[in-house]
Amino acid sequence: MPDGGPDLARTSGDQLVTLPNLITFARLCAVPLAFWLVIDRRPGAAFALFLAAGVSDAIDGWLARRMGGASQVGALIDPVADKALLVTMFITLAAVNEMPSWLAILVVFRDAVIVGGVLVLGLLGRAVVIRPLFVSKANTALQIMLVALTLFMAGYGAHGGWVTPVLDALTWAVAASTLASGAAYVWRAARGG
């Protein structure tokens, strides 16, 4: 750059604008739309958008690997986009009484503890390496299933029968895995890992 400023096309030898990153940015930009669709009582459309976001998550990862590896930007923004969508869905579905408020609070609290812990450790000068744990990956999978089923039920009137017990079981599984994954991250941080 002529002025000596950063080159926005490249960051530390890593491209900012790539097809996988554009897909991830589009998913992040879809979060406000998903919020509005739930608030405006259009859960069927929110369900379709949530599924599209899931497909885009798989596609951007596949493309990143196929195009020569994941970028640093993608490695940062992809989990942010995923978490932003999930947390927004939990809060919004609780706000419209499609999901228990206590569960949304638990999910948000766990994420706040993890982010707060990373910030505190960083301020204390401790190196922070963020590596997802198996229990955290399981928690995310359960959260995705719960949000998808909740949106599906609300959007397509799929109440009763097998759906209600599955939804109840998923609710408790998400609560348990949220607590377990939060505790695992706190334990790992306390041990210096």
Model-based region annotation:
Residues 1-193:
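Alpha-helical transmembrane bundles and membrane-interface segments of multipass inner-membrane proteins
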